[in-house]
Amino acid sequence: MNIVNNTMYDKDLILRYNKFYARSYMIKNFIVITVISLGFATYMAIEEQWSYAALLLGILLVYYVLTLGMQKLTTAKMLKRSPLVDNPMLQTYVFKEEEFVVTNVKSSNVLYTTVQSVKRAPDFFMIQTSDRKTYIVDFKGFDNPEDKIELANFFNTKFNAKIKL
């Protein structure tokens, strides 16, 4: 296998990554908190403690709004500090059987044994390694559309990733 991908690390990619990360954060954390809060609010309503039930639901709503606001502020701060906004960088990935090679200013090899997870966003793969590095592989960076499918199938086989395209 020798699949090549050229991903442009720029403002657009940063925004898409943050949107994906924020959505997954909200799904994981907010759903659990909402279910627990709704359970307590229902109990309070059954006990006819309407003001406490309303207060709990109000706190839940404020938490949701603050979480969204913090994510927007964090993204805005990051965009101000990121050199990729003014100087986009092309990162080339070459996926092989036992490793992938990452090339930008310098080149490095990443063994698949160090990969902890592979996730699929709507328009990129996100590869996370044990040394806490994240590699974003943009779907637009494949020369051949079949390469994206082949790479997804490879990830499914190698990591039991269950990626659907």
Question: Would you name each region that the model predicts?
Answer:
Residues 39-62:
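Hydrophobic alpha-helical transmembrane segments
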